[in-house]
């Protein structure tokens, strides 16, 4: 069963779909969607629980990079299909409305 498609969940899926072949980190997704962290991260966790998103830790040396590692997010094949279905079912308008 797919997750409930709230406006916020749709915004996250569509932001990930916009660059589906790239990895995204939380701050990037917050900027793209306008969602706050308290809304974004629970949505990502739900999407990952449903197999639509996968996440993993960035492979960097935090000391050399001068910053902590980021958790990266990417759509799975099922996530791409779900997001494309969502896009095709929308009738014009703003993707984040």
What kind of feature is each model-predicted range?
Residues 19-22, 50, 78-81:
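Short, charged/polar surface micro-motifs in flexible loops or helix N-caps
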Residues 69:
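Exposed loop/turn and edge beta-strand positions of beta-sandwich/beta-sheet ligand-binding modules
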Residues 2-39:
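N-terminal helix-turn-helix DNA-binding core of bacterial DNA-binding proteins
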Residues 78-97:
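Amphipathic alpha-helical dimerization/coiled-coil segments
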Residues 50-66:
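Beta-hairpin "wing" of winged helix-turn-helix
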Residues 40-52:
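Basic amphipathic alpha-helical segments that dock to polyanions
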Residues 45, 58, 85:
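Surface loops and adjacent helix of pleckstrin homology
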């Amino acid at each position: 069963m797919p997750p409930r498609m709230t406006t916020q969940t749709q915004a996250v899926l569509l932001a990930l779909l916009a660059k589906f072949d790239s990895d995204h980190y939380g701050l990037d997704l917050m900027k793209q969607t306008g969602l706050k962290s308290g809304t974004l991260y629970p949505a990502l966790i739900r999407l990952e629980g449903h197999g639509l998103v996968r996440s993993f830790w960035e492979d960097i040396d935090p000391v050399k990079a001068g910053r902590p590692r980021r958790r990266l997010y990417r759509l799975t094949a099922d996530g791409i299909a779900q997001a494309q279905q969502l896009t095709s079912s929308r009738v014009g308008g703003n993707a984040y409305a």
